[in-house]
């Protein structure tokens, strides 16, 4: 580990992540066995999770990406900015939004409403990480990898100021850390 990562505390191992993502892929494959869903990955954080999840599904599917920003450092800005929209037509299609983490719920609520506005057949949400009790959502999160404590996490695509996405396990930054 580099100096900036020495203060991190491991939350989830590579094996725990791999096993859970594979289980999520199997569950999605069963639920969508008669469909050709469109997986919409939320950039940048979900790209590693999305790739592993897609390798775990056994159904035909399509892929697109959307990019929003709501964080600056370790704090949510409270506003969502759309940086890249989807490019495919989702009208009448089953859509699965693939998110890295649901924390405040602002991003996923914005995305869910935006996707619903394009008149898909259905919209499901798959998230690797979920901080329960914090997000106030008026829809269900269909596929949850892990429920985690209210800590700031990095690794496996999740970042702190665009750094530490490359870590193959998920770590949390201890409270009071000067990272």
Regions found by a protein language model. Give the residues of each.
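PRPP-associated nucleotide enzymes
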Residues: 1-179
């Amino acid at each position: 580990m580099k100096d900036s990562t020495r203060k991190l505390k491991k939350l989830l191992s590579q094996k725990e992540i791999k096993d859970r993502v594979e289980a999520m892929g199997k569950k999605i494959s069963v639920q969508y066995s008669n469909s050709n869903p469109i997986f919409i990955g939320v950039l940048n954080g979900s790209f590693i999770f999305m790739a592993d999840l897609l390798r775990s599904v056994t159904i035909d599917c399509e892929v697109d990406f959307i990019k929003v920003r709501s964080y600056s450092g370790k704090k949510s800005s409270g506003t969502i900015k759309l940086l890249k929209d989807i490019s495919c037509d989702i009208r009448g299609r089953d859509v699965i939004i693939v998110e890295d983490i649901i924390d405040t719920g602002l991003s996923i609520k914005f995305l869910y409403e935006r996707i619903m506005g394009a008149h898909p057949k259905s919209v499901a949400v798959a998230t690797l990480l979920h901080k329960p009790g914090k997000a106030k959502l008026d829809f269900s999160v269909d596929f949850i990898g892990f429920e985690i404590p209210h800590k700031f996490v990095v690794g496996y695509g999740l970042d702190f100021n665009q750094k530490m996405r490359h870590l193959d396990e998920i770590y949390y930054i201890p409270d009071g850390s000067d990272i």
